[in-house]
Curated annotation (Swiss-Prot):
Keywords: Cell cycle, Cell division, Cell inner membrane, Cell membrane, Cell shape, Cell wall biogenesis/degradation, Glycosyltransferase, Membrane, Peptidoglycan synthesis, Transferase. It is an enzyme of class 2 (transferase). Belongs to the glycosyltransferase 28 family. MurG subfamily. It is a peripheral membrane protein. It is found in: Cell inner membrane. Cell wall formation. Catalyzes the transfer of a GlcNAc subunit on undecaprenyl-pyrophosphoryl-MurNAc-pentapeptide (lipid intermediate I) to form undecaprenyl-pyrophosphoryl-MurNAc-(pentapeptide)GlcNAc (lipid intermediate II). One of its GO terms (molecular function) is glycosyltransferase activity. It comes from Gloeobacter violaceus (strain ATCC 29082 / PCC 7421). SUPFAM superfamilies: UDP-Glycosyltransferase/glycogen phosphorylase. It catalyses: di-trans,octa-cis-undecaprenyl diphospho-N-acetyl-alpha-D-muramoyl-L-alanyl-D-glutamyl-meso-2,6-diaminopimeloyl-D-alanyl-D-alanine + UDP-N-acetyl-alpha-D-glucosamine = di-trans,octa-cis-undecaprenyl diphospho-[N-acetyl-alpha-D-glucosaminyl-(1->4)]-N-acetyl-alpha-D-muramoyl-L-alanyl-D-glutamyl-meso-2,6-diaminopimeloyl-D-alanyl-D-alanine + UDP + H(+). This is UDP-N-acetylglucosamine--N-acetylmuramyl-(pentapeptide) pyrophosphoryl-undecaprenol N-acetylglucosamine transferase. It holds the Pfam family Glyco_tran_28_C. Pathway: Cell wall biogenesis; peptidoglycan biosynthesis. Its EC number is 2.4.1.227.
Length: 357
């Protein structure tokens, strides 16, 4: 008997794609194909794993005008493309983690009476998911409290899936020889970088290094050269644009300084990493602040708005944390309590239930 076919619609950022890949890895009984957008991250991560179909698409601007008309035309074309794909290749259902591609995929599935299942990682669901949820068979949630933001939908708290490497015993940091007794700070600004965070950390770094602390600073592609040129060489200050082996890095970290994207927070929770969160101030509906607040309430993190934070305040806060191992231990324990390590399996179970019934 041939395997049932499942179309995964996930595009754009790692926050959409990595959870979808984790769920796909749990669904070996399905024949999976992927629907995305040209020139986005899925074009690097998906080929070689699953067949990838792409269709041009951009977000709808709030204000009507030429760009809005073009985006609306693309959305309708993407809907027709998705509908033809689902029909001609006899897919049994659609799974989406949100983003622009979710709308045409879910609406196409509904028009063919096929089940659509979604997953929302953020505490405050995105507008696309909030609008589409009523037409989904079920919506998996990364945070239980997210159900209050979604009306007319069947929801289930499943946690946010993380990459499989976060669920195995981490290997040693072969490329970063941090002494066992040395505190390690990991700084993460996102894939494109966070200039404000990078600048504040650069100001604080000399004092931290004098105290014997190690720093792994992930600048993002757009900020690497500026940070590298403005920072003196020091064996305990390692600067990279990206770092692929995040599971062992975060497992070794004593403290993370980070934005508050949902996928990153899930990785911090699974690894039990205390964090100082600086939400991206221009995120849609300030949803990163809502994410960060959930970890603060659980005792797993501290939160500062970018506008309110300065290098001296960052320095004092980090020193207070690293000088108090008991506080860090409590934060780490709180993070692990909030984590859902088997979120990928739980979400895959939800997909199975919806597609088969």
């Amino acid at each position: 008997m041939p395997k049932p076919r499942l179309l995964i619609a996930a595009s754009g950022t790692g926050g959409h794609i990595f959870p979808a890949l984790a769920v796909a890895g749990e669904l070996s009984e399905f024949e999976i194909a992927w629907l995305g957008v040209p020139d986005r991250l899925e074009n690097k991560l998906v080929p070689g794993r699953y067949p990838l179909h792409t269709v041009a698409l951009q977000g709808l601007n709030r204000k009507p005008g030429p760009q809005w008309l073009e985006a609306a035309s693309q959305t309708f074309a993407a809907y027709r493309y998705a509908r033809n794909l689902l029909s001609q290749e006899r897919f049994a259902g659609v799974f989406t983690t949100g983003g622009y591609i979710a709308a045409p995929a879910v609406l196409a599935a509904r028009s063919l009476n096929l089940p659509a299942i979604g997953h929302e990682s953020n505490v405050l669901p995105g507008k696309v998911i909030r609008y589409l949820a009523r037409w989904m068979r079920s919506l998996g949630l990364g945070f239980a409290e997210s159900a209050t933001y979604v009306s007319g939908a069947t929801t289930r708290w499943v946690g946010t899936p993380v990459r499989p490497e976060f669920l195995i015993s981490p290997n040693p940091l072969l490329d970063v020889p941090v002494p066992p007794e040395a505190p390690l700070i990991v700084v993460m600004g996102g894939s494109q970088g966070a200039r404000a965070i990078n600048q504040m950390v650069g100001e604080c770094a000399p004092g931290w290094l004098e105290r014997g602390w190690w720093i792994v600073h992930l600048t993002g592609a757009g900020e690497y050269d500026a940070v590298r040129e403005g920072t003196p060489d020091h064996p305990a200050y390692r600067i990279y644009a990206f770092w692929e082996k995040m599971a062992p890095l975060l497992s070794r970290a004593d403290l993370a300084i980070s934005r508050a994207g949902a996928a990153t927070l899930s990785e911090l929770l699974v690894t039990g990493t205390p964090s100082l969160l600086i939400p991206y101030p221009f995120a849609a509906e300030d949803h990163q602040s809502v994410n960060a607040a959930a970890l603060v309430r659980a005792g797993a993190a501290l939160q500062f708005s970018q506008a309110a934070l300065s290098a001296p305040l960052l320095d004092r806060t980090v020193q207070a944390l690293l000088d108090n191992p008991e506080t860090l231990a409590r934060m780490a324990a709180s993070a692990r309590r909030l984590a859902v390590p088997d979120a990928a399996r739980r979400t895959a179970d939800l997909v199975r239930e919806c597609v088969r019934h």
